Amino acid sequence: MKLIIGVITLFPQMFDALKSGVIGRALKQDRLTLSFWNPRDYATDPHRTVDDRPYGGGPGMVMKFEPLALALKAAKAQLGENTKVIHLTPQGKLLTQAIVREKIHASPLILLAGRYEGIDERLIEAEVDEEWSIGDYILSGGELPAMVLIDAMTRLLPGVLGHKDSASQDSFTAGLLDYLHYTRPEKIADRPVPSVLLSGDHEAISRWRLKQSLGRTWQRRQDLIKRRSLSENEQRLLDEFFEESS
């Protein structure tokens, strides 16, 4: 599987940070291809203008239709006319791990990173297939959300992570938060590693990890538990967690 992503952005240099770590490894392995189109390169006036004042008044500027439309046209000429366009915006649907798993199979994708007060709505109506948000807060532009999405999708590519089970055991992959992690030394001050992790009993370790995952999810994200239909074993482990924590 190869992930092909195009990005429409005024600041392609921001994405240089992706050349490190997991994403950098995927790029070197040719498991991931990133391409960029800057709307400013498609502005037709001498000042290469990409924004203008909003109709109806108000603060800030709005990204213009024409440069974005031409940038998207160039991107689709390279990636394919039917390539889906994803607009990163606080008004979008909340991005979840389930969506990431689904959309990795929709490659190639074009990510549209807006700036200023937003994008002319006519561009969104004409060109955008879906709108996604990474949370209920405001950033200066769509570049960071685009990088979040690229990172989340790249992690799911087979062979990109150091261990084959790393992605499958991440938080949210099974609809739960991650279990607790420990490494050497065995004891720090008065805080030892839980003895079960030193036992070598893989079944007991798996049981403990699931119990901690269920308990942590209940403590921090009860909405995830309520959306999940717990098995008898999971309910029993969650009850044990409550008893041990009381």
Swiss-Prot record:
Similarity-based family: Belongs to the RNA methyltransferase TrmD family.
Principal location: cytoplasm
Top-rank taxon: Bacteria
GO molecular function, one term: tRNA (guanine(37)-N1)-methyltransferase activity
Record has Methyltransferase as a keyword: yes
Pfam family, one: tRNA_m1G_MT
Reaction equations catalysed: guanosine(37) in tRNA + S-adenosyl-L-methionine = N(1)-methylguanosine(37) in tRNA + S-adenosyl-L-homocysteine + H(+)
Function recorded in the entry: Specifically methylates guanosine-37 in various tRNAs.
Organism: Coxiella burnetii (strain RSA 331 / Henzerling II)
Assembly and binders: Homodimer.
Protein name, per record: tRNA (guanine-N(1)-)-methyltransferase
